[in-house]
Amino acid sequence: MCGRARLPTDVSEIKQDLKIEWDKLGDYRPRWNAAPTSELPVVTAAQGGRTLEIMRWGLIPSWAKDPKISRTTFNARAEALDSTPAFRGAWRAGQRCLVVADGYYEWRKADKQPFAVALGNRAPMTFAGLWDTWHSPSGATINSFAVITTRPNALIAPIHDRMPVILASDCWAAWLGEVDAAEHELKAMLKPYPAERMTRWPVDKRVGNARYDGPDLFEPLREAS
C-alpha cells in the first residue's frame, strides 16, 4: 500500500530528467503529505511528446456512477490489473502513466510507526500508474490515477507487505507507450525496486494527519527505532 507521498519540490529537474514537452501543471506547489484524492504530478505520453500534468489520486473508472469510488482505488495490485473491474479498462486501453514523487510514507504494522521512503540518491521516484477520465452528469471532467503496487523488497518487507512499483528510466518509454511492448513485457516491469538503491527512516507520527503538511514531516525521528 502507498497512501501518502511527498510531492516533488524541484519541478525543473523533473522536466529535464523526463524530457517533458508539455507542462500543464498550472499553479503547482510542492506538498509533504499528499493523501488520496489529492492532486499529484503525472506524466503521460502521446504523439506530441510527454506531458506533465496534475491528476487526482484515486482512479475513477470512466463507467463509475459516483466519484467517491476513488477513496478505494488509489492503489492497484500488479497481479490483478486485468481482472479488477476498476482498473481493467485503463489497463486494456493502454492508459499508463508515471506518477512523480520525492518519496512516500509507510506505516510499520507492528507499532504504527511511520517511515519515509526515498531513493538512496534522493532523485525523484517514478511510480507506475494507470489513469482514466471520468465525466460527471453535469459535464465536469476528472482525470485520475492509481499507483500500482507489488510485493515488497528487503527494505520494505519489515514494515509492510506491499510497495509501489518504481520504474527505472530505461522502462519509461515502453511504459508510456512510446515504443512497442508486449503485455508480458509490461507486466515484467511490475516488480520490486532494488532495495540497495533505496533508503527509509522513521518520521513523526503527525504524518498520519492528512491536514498537516510541512517539510519537517520528512525529517528523521531520531528517538524511534
Named regions from a protein language model:
Residues M1-S225:
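Short linear sequence motif anchored by a di-proline
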